[in-house]
Structures are given as C-alpha cells and as structure tokens.
Amino acid sequence: MRKETVRNQRCAGTKADFLLALFIGRSPETETACPASSGMKRSGIEVCTAGEWVATKEIKRLQRIKMIELWNVNKTYETGNKALRNINITVEDGEFVFIIGRSGSGKSTLLKLLLKEVEPTSGKIIVNDMNLGKMPRRYIPKYRRRLGMIFQDFRLLKDRNVYENVAFAQRVIGASARSIRESVPTMLTMVGLSSKYKFYPQQLSGGEQQRVAIARALINRPEILLADEPTGNLDGHNSMEIMKLLDEINKRGTTVIVVTHSHEIVDRMKRRVITMDRGTIVSDEKKGGYTHED
C-alpha cells in the first residue's frame, strides 16, 4: 500500500478517531517495526511515519504478538497465604481481557505482579519481551510509565482541578510545559471533559471522575491499560459509558485488562474472560460471559 493511501485512510476518520490514534498505544513517532521497504532507520530500528503507523498496528495484530506472558507463576505472601497457584496466561497485543472471580481469588495480586508492586514466589513474567524478574530496580519507574492504571476509587488529587490532575502524570516524568499544554487539552477532549477542565473532583459526577482517571492513565501513551474494578462506584449508565470508552481505546491498539465483578458488563461486552478461584484459573473463554458463581 502506498504511503499516500494509508495516510488518506487515517485522515478520513472523525476528530475523536484522530485523537485516539495519536494518544492511545504507541505514538506515530514510536520506534517500531514498519512495513517492508518503508520508514526511516534510527540506530538500526525502522521508524514509521504517522500514516504507516496505523497500517503497522494492523500488521502487528495479524502477527498475534504476545504482550503479556505468565509461565507457572506462584505467589505466596509472608503470612502463608497462597494468592496464586501455577498461573499460565498469554495476552496478545491489542487484546481486551476481563478477569473475574470472588474476593480473594488472586485478581488483585495478578495486577500487582504486572505493576511490579510485588514479586512472584516462582515462575516467569514477560511483558512486551521484558523479563520482569531480571529487570534492574532502577528501570522499574520507566517500565511503569508503559502501563496505565485506573482504580475503583478514582484516586484523584482533591485539591487540584481536572486539568492539573491529568497534567500531574506528565510532570512526574519530566514532560516539558509545552508538551503538557498541548497534550492535556487534547486528552480531555477525547474523554469528553474539555469544558470542565477547571472543575475540581468534588464538583464532578462519579462517571466524570473516572473519565479524569482514564485521561490521566492514558496521557503518557501506555501500551497496556490495567483497570481494577473501574465501574465499582458507578451506576449502570455511567458504568456502560466508561466501558464504551475503554472499548474504543482498545480498538485503537492498547491492550486492556479489566478486573470486575459486574455480570452485566462482562455478559454484554463478549470479550475474553479469565475466571479465577482460590488463586487458580478455572476457565479462559475467548468470548465468554460471567459464569462464575459468587
């Protein structure tokens, strides 16, 4: 496909499509494998142009690249609690995965392992070709920037407005003032909060607060978005609106993993469902529903 054709296809979408393509997953300037005979080379790595990036994401999806791999992972806490037992999971680049199960089944421990908040007792965890067990401690903060995280309780800074909450995530990684001025308004437009950038968290609804949290999680263009009960404090309508946003984000290439207890959301979305119980995986359905009994 010629560059002009790819670029024209990319520009044919809506403004929201463009914003999502720009900010979700890897940016157009990310160093990644480009289609054969295209792209420039930087230090031996081919670099895609903006138009080629979209086509490259499709190529990667077709190649079914593994984003996350857990091999025989076990986690026993110092208390003796065996949180995870012989966990084997592969999540491909661009997948949307639900993880369900009753409280204490190991779901949160699984997310903590991916964030490197805790270490496995045994086994191997690979994220985007990186062996987390061999990762130097000094590299962990940089690694975590490649992950986005949203929580049930939003975890917003109550004394800062919407704009400042999202900008904070860029300031902590040393982003320039110019970068913040350009990227934060764009991200707020993407999540539908451009008109409320001066509002404080207590002035927003629960659904709006979660949108701020999503914008903050995505502002640094993560490859993976982890969501721990993202709709737990929301009503049915706002829950589905948040899931529609996560679904759209996923369709633009970001790998999304959602821990939830919501039967309605899981049944309606029809995505991959991993069910956990007592630290083990009891089922893994590619397009499942909520079959676990609480």
Q: Regions from the language model: what does each represent?
A:
Residues 115:
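Helix-to-loop junction immediately C-terminal to a conserved catalytic motif
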Residues 123-131, 143:
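Conserved ABC transporter NBD signature motif
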Residues 160-167:
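Short coil-to-helix segment of the ABC ATPase nucleotide-binding domain corresponding to the Q-loop/switch region
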Residues 200-204, 208-210:
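Conserved ABC ATPase signature
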Residues 214:
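Hydrophobic anchor residue at the start of the ABC signature
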Residues 219-223:
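A short, proline-enriched helix->beta-strand linker immediately N-terminal to the Walker B motif
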Residues 225-228:
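Catalytic Walker B motif of ABC-type/P-loop ATPase nucleotide-binding domains
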